[in-house]
């Protein structure tokens, strides 16, 4: 590794402390107050149970609910909290160059974190596998002659088998007040002794990163430090573990001075100045987001924490109420607010979707994804909306279970509302973030001379012709309405989870409630009707990723 790409961790920490000293404050009294409240208010038998859960090799939804419930109790007992607040950064206090640098680093950090949560190396998988998949993997490893992962070794696999992995977000951070309360109660040590011990650890942290050897030497003076242990894996360490990192953070928060990063307070009024200072430190020491998967370096750490929440103490506060990740909670708007000359601002809702197509990177991504379409496989197409104003398009290949399914914000909102009542039942508000330009890009990328099946071809033919795709051939199966809808309920029962956009009540001309029309469901319904049976799909997936289908209008989401 070249010197220019060497992470000089403590040197970076010291530089960040110098640059951000005006954003730090004395939080010692507040931390001790919160620790006292936790000592008096927490059920430590439940704390012990959660610590046991965090030692399990496989954890499920019940375990997660137990952790989240205890976290909620902690949240209700403390004053130091970070709140969920979206932060939109525009050119102004931060220059366009600084915003672009910030955007690039957040994107790199996102990629690094996602890789660390789902690494490919055998035996170090950190994502969500079901119990059945884990057992099956063990059998496969034995078949191919690979050893079963050592359960007690470093890099132990601990997996959350949960239905909604987003509920794991922001549930594992350490808090000085919680660390102190657990140390005092569970080691039967007075809180004042814990404060003194951690303060000494914090003083050491002003000149170096404390390690286990330092800890061993300090134990003679402070026996309570004996509860601190080395964590073999940093995967999902909770606030209830006695890790060295948690203890060092607590020590830093207890110092009256030292300009410790742990005492930074971020507010809407100072967030841009704080980020500007962070970027200033980055430039001075050539800090960067490392490609290496693992613990975050000091620059990555402060970047993530500050962008996660727009209000609160990013290092030491309770953040379990925050929704989303750093790249979701910080958005960058690089558009100019200066109106065009002689161009009156349109009334809200009157101009339709923003006239912005795909970016170059999105176009290249779509081109790669569309390469997975089999041009010779039987393929269905269906649309919702008008041919000149479609709001939903689906292309489905039953042989391999793959499909293209996306949405479009309508131009004619009055017509959309009529169609919603009598056909698709979609909510206009749900389409505001649909990616503009996707319809033309997808249709333009379909293989040359492809043959598509449909039930009713007039609107689809007009849509294809409007995109100069007269080479694409249509086969209209021309079933009766009754025959075409025969498998409607069965398809919705089995595959309805694939689309959650049809939320309204739909009535026919006789004002009788009917099932909303979904372009994707209709493709599967027509396939079922034509074969007189439900398709047996081993796998089913949309080749378009969610962040290509949706985006914030005029805003780049990081």
Swiss-Prot record:
Effect of residue 384 to A: Decreases interaction with host IKBKE, defective to inhibit IKBKE kinase activity and IRF3 activation
Protein transport as UniProt keyword: no
Disulfide bonds: none
One GO-annotated biological process of the protein: symbiont-mediated suppression of host NF-kappaB cascade
Pfam families registered for this protein in UniProt: Arena_ncap_C (PF17290), Arena_nucleocap (PF00843)
Effect of residue 459 to A: Decreases interaction with host IKBKE, defective to inhibit IKBKE kinase activity and IRF3 activation
Binding site for Mn(2+): 382, 384, 522
Keyword presence, Metal-binding: yes
Binding site for Zn(2+): 392, 499, 502, 518
InterPro entries recorded: Nucleocapsid_arenaviridae (IPR000229), Nucleocapsid_C_arenaviridae (IPR035084), Nucleocapsid_C_sf (IPR038115), Nucleocapsid_N_arenaviridae (IPR035083)
Domain-level remarks: The N-terminal region is important for the cap-binding activity while the C-terminal region contains the 3'-5' exoribonuclease activity. A CCHE zinc binding site is present in the C-terminal region and may thus contribute to the substrate binding and/or the specificity of the exonuclease activity.
Job of this protein: Encapsidates the genome, protecting it from nucleases. The encapsidated genomic RNA is termed the nucleocapsid (NC). Serves as template for viral transcription and replication. The increased presence of protein N in host cell does not seem to trigger the switch from transcription to replication as observed in other negative strain RNA viruses.
Name of the molecule in the record: Nucleoprotein
């Amino acid at each position: 590794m070249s010197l220019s790409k060497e992470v000089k961790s403590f040197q970076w920490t010291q530089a960040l402390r110098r640059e951000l000293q005006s954003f730090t404050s004395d939080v010692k009294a507040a931390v001790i107050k919160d620790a006292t409240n936790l000592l008096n208010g927490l059920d430590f038998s439940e704390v012990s149970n959660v610590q046991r859960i965090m030692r399990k090799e496989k954890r499920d939804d019940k375990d997660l609910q137990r952790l989240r419930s205890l976290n909620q109790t902690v949240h209700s007992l403390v004053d130091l909290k970070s709140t969920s607040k979206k932060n939109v950064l525009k050119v102004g206090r931060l220059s366009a160059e600084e915003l672009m640098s910030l955007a690039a680093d957040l994107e790199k950090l996102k990629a690094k974190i996602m890789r660390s949560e789902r690494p490919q190396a055998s035996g170090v998988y950190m994502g969500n596998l079901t119990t059945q998949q884990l057992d099956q993997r063990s059998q496969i490893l034995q078949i191919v002659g690979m050893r079963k992962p050592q359960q007690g070794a470093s890099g132990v696999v601990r997996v959350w088998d949960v239905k909604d992995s987003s509920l794991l977000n922001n549930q594992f951070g350490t808090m000085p007040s919680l660390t102190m309360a657990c140390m005092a109660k569970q080691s039967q040590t007075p809180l004042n002794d814990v404060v003194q011990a951690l303060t000494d650890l914090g003083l050491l942290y002003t000149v170096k990163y404390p390690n286990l050897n330092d800890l061993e030497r300090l134990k003679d003076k402070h026996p309570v430090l004996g509860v601190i242990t080395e964590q073999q894996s940093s995967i999902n360490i909770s606030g209830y573990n006695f890790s060295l990192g948690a203890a060092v953070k607590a020590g830093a928060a207890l110092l009256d001075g030292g300009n410790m990063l742990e005492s930074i307070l971020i507010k809407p009024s100072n967030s841009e100045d704080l980020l500007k200072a962070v970027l200033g430190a980055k430039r001075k020491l050539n800090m960067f987001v490392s490609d290496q998967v693992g613990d975050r370096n000091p620059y990555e750490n402060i970047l993530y924490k500050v962008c996660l929440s727009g209000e609160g103490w990013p290092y030491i506060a309770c953040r379990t109420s925050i929704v989303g990740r750093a790249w979701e909670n910080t958005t960058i708007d690089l558009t100019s607010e200066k109106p065009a000359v002689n161009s009156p601002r349109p009334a809200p809702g009157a101009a339709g979707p923003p006239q912005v197509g795909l970016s170059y990177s999105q176009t290249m991504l779509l081109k790669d994804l569309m390469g997975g379409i089999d041009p010779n496989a039987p393929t269905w197409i269906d649309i919702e909306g008008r041919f000149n104003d479609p709001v939903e398009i689906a292309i489905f290949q039953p042989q391999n279970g793959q499909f293209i399914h996306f949405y479009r914000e309508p131009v004619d909102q009055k017509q959309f509302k009529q169609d919603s009542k009598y056909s698709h039942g979609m909510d206009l508000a749900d389409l505001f973030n649909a990616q503009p330009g996707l319809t033309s890009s997808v249709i333009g990328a379909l293989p040359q001379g492809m043959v598509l099946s449909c039930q009713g071809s007039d609107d689809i033919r007009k849509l294809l012709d409007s995109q100069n795709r007269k080479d694409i051939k249509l086969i209209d199966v021309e079933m009766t309405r009754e025959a075409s809808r025969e498998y409607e309920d069965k398809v919705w029962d089995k595959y309805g989870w694939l689309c959650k956009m049809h939320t309204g009540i739909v009535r026919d001309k006789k004002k009788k409630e009917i099932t909303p029309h979904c372009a994707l469901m209709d493709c599967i319904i027509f396939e079922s009707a034509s074969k007189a049976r439900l398709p047996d799909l081993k796998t089913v997936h949309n080749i378009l990723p969610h962040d290509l289908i949706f985006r914030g209008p005029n805003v780049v989401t990081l």
